[in-house]
């Protein structure tokens, strides 16, 4: 989101001599990144090329009854000849001359011309031609004192401005106003000893009046922790004065009327949203802050009828709703030219509530942008007083009664303990205790307590993202200047360090492998909804890391696994007719130990992992049936991935995958340590139903720390290419259903020792031709001796041992 800041408006609050370009550079250096800087002129082009000139001679044109040939003094040694058709041109006049090359209006360029045979080198201008008036009765005649050669821009005193567009991050709502930007810039200038002064408008003249104000009733205190209403009677709604209109136009806002313009002005001045209601339209003479009725209909200012949810916070009167709180006003309660009495709302609304309503109704407004990110709860009173005083000044009227307020629980400023040595350790430079304190004072931090080694500070209420010491350190560092932290002259490192696998290289290798096999990488939000974990045993809800101030209940916990985010992606694609999905993700997962108090870091755990997903069927080909994604296809990818780093999947310890996540599958652990490496299988129907998925999904999750441990264990070794041929043999055996291929493979390699190189399963048969509870495996074996060519006797001896082992250990029968 971009915040538009008018340079001239900004200087109302910050006295300094910085040019717009210097202001933009300073803002970017302190974390308010300026995306664009645009010069704004009262008249487009600034009348460049138009100057004050004096008519020295004026004679009639010989071939015209209305044209005049004039000679003008422009300040140059030679007079300039201009043919003019204005009836009021005369010698001795001071006029505004558009010289050759000047562009007036959109595209009217002044050129050297010949009019009725006489050369003309410019144009003497009327008001409408310059864009400063509508008169075209004649040329614009200036006062005799006008100085020849003066640019028209300077003579007319045309205003210029600069529009600074700041790319605001979600945590910097404190800079979503001119005063907010001025505060930050003031701290920067003070730290750099640049003369400046911060001017915050005084509201001490505000005084409550006599009579009865419109009362308020807040029944949804959780949605409106602080709500105020000011009643102003006898206002005259009209067009705003020119200065106010210019300020709003400078940042792209359309002036409406003086009352509405004042609320918009204060919003962009202070950052506190306001709303003005026509008091005559408040039925029952009372304002109620409540939740909407489920299914309630409400027509907003844009004329759209909206269906409300019981979660929507509403501003209502005794009979019906008037406004979606903090989001959008209603069609029937707004201020019009007929309004004489105004109810002025200033409030602090629950950010989560506002965000959900804004998202639910697809309404993004300046007010909702600020409320959902956390407006300043302590600016509510100041903004209301500022707007009320401006309404009295520009629209007349009197404040009636006392300001009505609901503020049951006072919101206190956050207190943070600071250790100066730790701050300098984080910064990487000894900047001095005095510098730390001066920066914090310039940023309006209050020192609750000071010691020789640190301090206790109260954080300004508008800094909604500052909670901990590290947050304060970030504030200090951005004002001190990242560029002022010098790199050390020497870096200490061992020149004999053994080469180790680089995590980034390994991750890139994994990503390249998966992408080459048709997987698409996804990146999901680490925040998710707690409801996903309510029925899981493997990842129980009580182990979720909860967010203190979630923007939404859909984003109220950190994810414990990548599997659920992946199912969200698959459901999203299937709903858009993309049924064949192969994705992978690398990201962090988080968990909380409920047996601990949660106040220390050892209560929480974070680690990274990979997740792979296959679902659906690829597009059909004329050459080959691609087949549907299945369990064994996924297992094949996992096997190849592990083999890429020197790990045989059959060397891993296995156990059944958790049943709440997979209907069938395996969990793999590192041998010896039992450290979990991967889990894979067919996603359980209950999980698919949770996301509305009606086709099978096959998923795997791989622990990155365990995988990297494997990479470090398996060093690359040189192996000589075999000189002697390999021999292949097949074996078909009848087995009990309980016997697994992995068991057979492990036994085969134990018996075959150095001659057996590969074991494969190429056919499985179950059917009415064999007994119930039995299955037939067709196995392939590759044998090879590195020192000689195998004879038939050598091969038969190994195959006999294999068959004997299968018969004795597994009850196998040769087919």
Give the label of every model feature segment.
Residues 116-131, 135-141, 152-162, 166, ...:
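Mobile "lid/hinge" segments at catalytic clefts and subdomain interfaces of large enzymes
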Residues 4, 441-448, 469, 524, ...:
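A carboxyl-terminal module marker
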Residues 7, 25, 30, 42, ...:
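Glycine/proline-enriched, intrinsically flexible loops and inter-domain linkers
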Residues 416-581, 729, 782-786, 794, ...:
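Extended, well-folded interaction surfaces typified by the phenylalanyl-tRNA synthetase beta subunit core
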Residues 42-46, 205-207, 266, 494-495, ...:
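Beta-rich nucleic-acid/ligand-interaction surfaces
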Residues 2-207, 343, 362, 366, ...:
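Phosphate-backbone binding interfaces of nucleic-acid-interacting proteins
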Residues 51-83, 149, 245, 257, ...:
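Conserved mixed alpha/beta core segments that line enzyme active sites in large multi-domain catalysts
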